[in-house]
Amino acid sequence: MQIILLEKVLNVGNLGDIVKVKDGYARNFLIPNKKARRATKEAIAEFEVRRAELEKVAAEKLSAAQAQGEKLSGMTVQIAQKAGVDGRLFGSVTNADIAAALGKQGFEVEKAQVRLPEGPLKMVGDHPVHVSLHTDVTVDVTVSVLGEHV
């Protein structure tokens, strides 16, 4: 399906690009999330009229993400979980737990923005985690998992 992108989409294209993607990806994700529209003549003409407005909104989102990224970069988040004597957790620390801990510290982060390169954290200690605030803004946060011995 031919679509016109209304914002930058990772691994697809930038604002204003007309790209061909799988029908399901367009119908189920891009179009409902207002990231794209079908590339009809009317939609392309309407986009060209609104291009400056959309570019301004995209620049505002990027600058807001960069500002939040500067505050968040290099930060350490502490999460306490029950653990055995060998340092292994009963359960694990997931991206939802990390997003909730960041929320308590005043940062609005969705769980989908937290990237765990090796999956959920299952050991006590410090772990590097990537937080993707925008397609162009990714910061590293250290998650310190503290063990509560049972």
Swiss-Prot record:
GO molecular function: rRNA binding; structural constituent of ribosome
Alphabetical UniProt keywords: Ribonucleoprotein, Ribosomal protein, RNA-binding, rRNA-binding
Coiled-coil regions listed in the entry: none
GO BP, one annotated term: translation
Pfam families with a match to the protein in the record: Ribosomal_L9_C, Ribosomal_L9_N
SUPFAM superfamilies given in the database record: L9 N-domain-like, Ribosomal protein L9 C-domain
GO CC terms in record: ribonucleoprotein complex; ribosome
Similarity section: Belongs to the bacterial ribosomal protein bL9 family.
Role this protein plays: Binds to the 23S rRNA.
Matches recorded under HAMAP family: Ribosomal_bL9
Protein name: Large ribosomal subunit protein bL9
Organism: Paraburkholderia phymatum (strain DSM 17167 / CIP 108236 / LMG 21445 / STM815)
Lineage start: Bacteria, Pseudomonadati, Pseudomonadota, Betaproteobacteria, Burkholderiales
